[in-house]
């Protein structure tokens, strides 16, 4: 495994795959993981986890060598495929008829999925989207080092699809010594804007890094969200202090563990700080409001290599006539307009226009147009 801030680079488009016969089919999650492993987004990982690292991550939130890592990055295959594979073999990694990489098989093992669900997602409830996906995927895991032999050609947002080495370069070019990362799978509403701008007061740059991999079906589609980020940045943010680029990973909905994972990945993209808000990467009522912040107390900033910035729940206060949080506003709940991505989605789907205290009008216009289009194509 590489050292903390060294980026792994496992992209080799000249790699000779002509003699490799066997192949493993990748689902969309494994495909996006393959890319992030190869481009260094998941440094220090150099491949899909073998049994030792897998067990260690599930049980201790660390790799076998002690490095912090909180989400198991695994390659599931069916029992039938597993029977045809053996340790030491090189196997092609395929999706949609294209070979995207190879794996040097080091390990083939059957995980205890119930244990993985319980420890990673804190529930075995199949109504939880992460658990549902875990149980739907095949039941044998293949571990081993990978090489990415073909870059994806159909990235939906090519101009915003940058590798960690490119975002690091971009921050350097802009002279940013300190950069705060913000992870989102929702359109940015006023509470997010308030938090981002509060963080921007103490660092050189903001890295807005929306997740555009697989999400649950009622999340707003990535293309609509991207347009909403563009109009927001154009109209309400200083252009030289913000950089927008996509995070092509799938959403795990693993709450606290995913908050650690999101921070580690943003460190690889070049961030020095990472925003952790209310119920980060949560879903439903599976996690406590500030559980994703509390989990960080188990690790030192040195071993994480990135500084988490914790924010209270923010809201619009009708008495203050401004965005605020419980840290800055003395008024009661009756004066607070609570904003959330879920609430915005709900209003829009019911044909209601969120008030300007919720979302900027330009953003609302993009969302309404996008959701109308979605309804037409359904």
Curated annotation (Swiss-Prot):
Reactions catalysed, as given in the entry: sulfate + ATP + H(+) = adenosine 5'-phosphosulfate + diphosphate
Membrane spanning residue stretches: none
Top-tier EC class: transferase
Annotated keywords: ATP-binding, Nucleotide-binding, Nucleotidyltransferase, Transferase
UniProt cross-references to SUPFAM superfamilies, sorted A to Z: Nucleotidylyl transferase, PUA domain-like
This protein's pathway: Sulfur metabolism; hydrogen sulfide biosynthesis; sulfite from sulfate: step 1/3
Gene Ontology biological process: hydrogen sulfide biosynthetic process; sulfate assimilation
Gene3D superfamilies the UniProt entry points to: HUPs, Sulfate adenylyltransferase
EC number: 2.7.7.4
An annotated Gene Ontology molecular function: sulfate adenylyltransferase (ATP) activity
PANTHER family associated with the record: PTHR43509, SULFATE ADENYLYLTRANSFERASE
HAMAP family the UniProt entry points to: Sulf_adenylyltr
Family indicated by similarity: Belongs to the sulfate adenylyltransferase family.
NCBIfam families from the UniProt entry: PRK04149.1, sopT
Protein name (Swiss-Prot/TrEMBL): Sulfate adenylyltransferase
Lineage of origin: Bacteria, Bacillati, Bacillota, Bacilli, Bacillales
């Amino acid at each position: 495994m590489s050292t903390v801030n060294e980026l792994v680079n496992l992209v080799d488009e000249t790699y000779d795959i002509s003699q490799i016969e066997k192949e493993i089919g990748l689902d969309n999650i494994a495909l996006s993981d393959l890319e992030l492993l190869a481009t260094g987004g998941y440094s220090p990982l150099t491949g899909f986890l073998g049994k030792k690292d897998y067990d260690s991550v599930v049980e201790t939130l660390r790799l076998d060598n002690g490095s912090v890592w909180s989400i198991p990055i695994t390659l599931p295959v069916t029992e039938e495929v597993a029977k045809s594979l053996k340790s030491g073999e090189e196997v092609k990694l395929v999706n949609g008829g294209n070979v995207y990489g190879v794996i040097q098989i080091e390990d083939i093992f059957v995980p205890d999925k119930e244990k993985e669900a319980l420890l990673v997602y804190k529930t075995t409830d199949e109504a939880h989207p992460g658990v549902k996906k875990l149980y739907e995927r095949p039941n044998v895991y293949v571990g081993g080092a990978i090489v990415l032999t073909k870059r994806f050609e159909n990235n939906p947002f090519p101009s915003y699809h940058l590798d960690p080495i490119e975002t690091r370069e971009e921050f350097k070019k802009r002279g940013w010594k300190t950069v705060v990362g913000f992870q989102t799978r929702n359109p940015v509403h006023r509470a997010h804007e308030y938090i981002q701008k509060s963080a921007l007061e103490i660092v050189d740059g903001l890295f807005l890094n929306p997740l555009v991999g697989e999400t649950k079906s009622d999340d707003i589609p990535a293309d609509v969200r991207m347009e909403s980020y563009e109009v927001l940045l154009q109209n309400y943010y200083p252009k030289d202090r913000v950089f927008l680029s996509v995070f092509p990973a799938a959403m795990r909905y693993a709450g606290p563990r995913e908050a650690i994972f999101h921070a580690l990945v943003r460190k690889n993209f070049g961030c020095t700080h990472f925003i952790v808000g209310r119920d980060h990467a949560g879903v439903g009522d599976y996690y406590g409001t500030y559980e994703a912040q509390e989990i960080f107390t188990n690790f030192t900033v040195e071993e994480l290599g990135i500084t988490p910035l914790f924010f209270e729940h923010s809201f619009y206060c009708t008495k203050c006539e401004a965005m605020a949080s419980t840290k800055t506003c003395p008024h009661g709940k009756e004066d607070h307009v609570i904003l959330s991505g879920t609430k915005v989605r709900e209003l829009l789907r019911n044909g209601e226009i969120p008030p300007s205290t919720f979302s900027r009008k330009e953003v609302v216009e993009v969302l309404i147009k996008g959701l109308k289009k979605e309804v037409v194509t359904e």
